């Protein structure tokens, strides 16, 4: 059952300006693994990646309804890519399943996060059959 949906849109150029001005921004927003993936990208793709992760974490905070800082911190949320490029969101000490979509168009990134409460059967199914893709 879906228990939360969050959406966020950010201007990629604005996030790029923040990264250029505030050297600690990336350290405070991204986990070490996310920073590693970000640094593999150059130019426009680097800014898209950082803006996408920032936006996705904001969308997660909207889906939960309690924001960043009170119960969940930036580093508690990690979004890494599968080999095919699909982003996967993992949240420390969070018992619900999360789904994230990140899309870029022009100077904007839009993200959607869905939080789902799984039944016991669904949790067991994921444990034994972790690849739960549509295709």
Swiss-Prot record:
It holds the Pfam family ACPS. One of its GO terms (cellular component) is cytoplasm. InterPro entries: 4-PPantetheinyl_Trfase_dom, 4-PPantetheinyl_Trfase_dom_sf, ACPS, Ppantetheine-prot_Trfase_dom. It is an enzyme of class 2 (transferase). It comes from the Bacteria. It catalyses: apo-[ACP] + CoA = holo-[ACP] + adenosine 3',5'-bisphosphate + H(+). GO terms for biological process: fatty acid biosynthetic process. Keywords: Cytoplasm, Fatty acid biosynthesis, Fatty acid metabolism, Lipid biosynthesis, Lipid metabolism, Magnesium, Metal-binding, Transferase. Its EC number is 2.7.8.7. Its cofactor is Mg(2+). GO terms for molecular function: holo-[acyl-carrier-protein] synthase activity; magnesium ion binding. It is found in: Cytoplasm. Belongs to the P-Pant transferase superfamily. AcpS family. Transfers the 4'-phosphopantetheine moiety from coenzyme A to a Ser of acyl-carrier-protein. This is Holo-[acyl-carrier-protein] synthase. It comes from Leuconostoc citreum (strain KM20).
């Amino acid at each position: 059952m879906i228990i939360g949906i969050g959406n966020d849109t950010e201007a990629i150029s604005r996030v790029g300006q923040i990264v250029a001005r505030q050297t600690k921004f990336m350290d405070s927003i991204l986990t070490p693994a996310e920073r590693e993936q970000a640094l593999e990208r150059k130019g426009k793709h680097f800014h898209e990646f950082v803006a996408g992760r920032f936006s996705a974490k904001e969308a997660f905070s909207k889906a939960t309804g309690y924001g960043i800082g009170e119960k969940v911190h930036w580093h508690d949320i990690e979004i890494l890519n599968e080999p095919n490029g699909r982003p996967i969101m993992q949240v420390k000490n969070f018992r619900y399943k999360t789904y994230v979509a990140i899309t870029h168009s022009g100077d904007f990134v839009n993200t959607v996060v869905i939080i789902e409460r799984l039944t016991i059967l669904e949790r067991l199914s994921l444990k034994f059959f972790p690849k739960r893709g549509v295709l």
